[in-house]
Amino acid sequence: MLDKVKLALLISFDDFDDELNDLIGAAVLDLNIAGVDDETTVSDDPTDKLIIRAICSYCGYHFELIHGTLERSEAFKKSYDEQKSQLSMATNYTTW
């Protein structure tokens, strides 16, 4: 998953790997709190394209907030919020 996040954020070096791994873990927990089934999210290499995009968007939001621009961070946040909302209402992604 780390390689997918780095590709989405256009990062080609390893300086931020620890921070990105923490963000990936936080993204998974945030999706689980929203009701997204952890069987879908708790994988070192998820294959579901919607889950991958949501995790990348979450990481982009928080990473850009610290290391980038507020404009890019807000764009990632908007994307993540929409993805999380849709996933939390989809019956094949939720725990309820």
Region locations from a protein language model:
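Amphipathic, heptad-repeat alpha-helical segments
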Residues: N21-L31
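Short, intrinsically disordered N-terminal pre-domain segments
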Residues: M1-D14, T95-W96
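Protein-protein interaction and targeting regions used for scaffolding, dimerization, and localization
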Residues: D30-D38
